[in-house]
Amino acid sequence: MGGWVSLSPTEKGNMITYSDTTTSEAIFYQPIDFIGYSHVQGLYPHESENWNENTYLYFLSLFKKTASGRFDYATKFTRYIAMDMEVTMPVNDNDEIDYAFMETYISAIKKLTIARLIEFIKCEKEAYRIAINN
């Protein structure tokens, strides 16, 4: 994100974006509507009913891992390269993309992260309390 403006969004949120003029580090999940510039590319799924924030975040990690280290400012990460990249997805017993697994996995990571953050805040408060009382 480059900042906040009062202009109306040009692109719908709930999608993965990347820049076709930089490295693979500029791959992001955009949860809300945004203003897209000419070099911001979007990844659009063939079937969209099963994609949500958690499944996109799971795919994002796979997509970034697949692209990582292959590009720099001389070797651009273009839309044509992105279209040809093969990303290995989790599949269920029917050999279909396992959206339920991706949803559950990312949901669990979010819950663990929140629990760790709460524990960190508690420890930090206790450290402040001890420092103030000494």
PLM feature spans:
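Amphipathic alpha-helical coiled-coil/heptad-repeat segments
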Residues: M85-N134
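DNA target-recognition domains and sequence-specific DNA-contacting regions of bacterial/archaeal
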Residues: M1-E86
